[in-house]
Amino acid sequence: MKYWKKLFFRRTKFFLVFVSLFFSFEFVFTSVAHENSESTANDITGGDFTLNSPDGPLSLQDLRGSVVLLFFGYTSCPNVCPISLATISNVLAEMSPAELEKTRTLFISLDPERDNLELLKKYTNYFHPNIVGLTDEISVLKKVAARYGIKYERSLKPESTLGYVISHSSDIIIVDPGGIVRKTFPHDTDTAPLLKELKLLLRVTTL
């Protein structure tokens, strides 16, 4: 009996280690699949754009006077996008009501085939009501993404229930109240430096 107990625990331990390693590898693989080379503010042309939101067309120009956070992704993104939006949500939670009034966050979906406006609204509201989901036709999205240094590519995954994934740059882009790109942060940035940058821009705005 003791022999079988030892054998059972050894096999169980091996199985748990194997499962842990498998999911660790899967997470790393998926993370790599959803990230490309990052951009810096100097690499970004930027500029105004108009995309569709759940409440109608929204232009970046309409947000003059506010600090804007831009993030490109898609709702089926398994890890990079949720991490980024959770970080942004934590930053927004640290702001005063007056600061929130002068801060806008735009989540631009690169997957218009799956991400309709109703789904985008539910997805962004899950993280924070200040986050607005935007999308449009693929041709329009490509132009906006290129101007903001976002590289992305759709890859078929027939073995996956999703059917395809989208590899994409994952910077959080900060646009100042004048519509100029000021800084970019990696998707896994800590809350503190992002919050510090936003507060700095907001203070400059109110001077």
Give residue spans per PLM region:
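Bacterial N-terminal signal peptides that target proteins for export
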Residues: 3-16
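Bacterial N-terminal signal peptides
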Residues: 15-26
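N-terminal "domain-start" segment that seeds a small globular fold
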Residues: 32-62, 86
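Short active-site neighborhood of thiol/selenol oxidoreductases, capturing the structured segment around
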Residues: 61-84, 88
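Conserved helix-turn-beta segment immediately C-terminal to the redox Cys motif
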Residues: 66, 83-108
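Thiol-based oxidoreductase modules, predominantly thioredoxin-like and allied folds used
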Residues: 102-114, 130-139
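Short, internal strand/loop/helix patches
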Residues: 121-169
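Thiol-/selenol-based redox modules, centered on thioredoxin-like
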Residues: 158-207
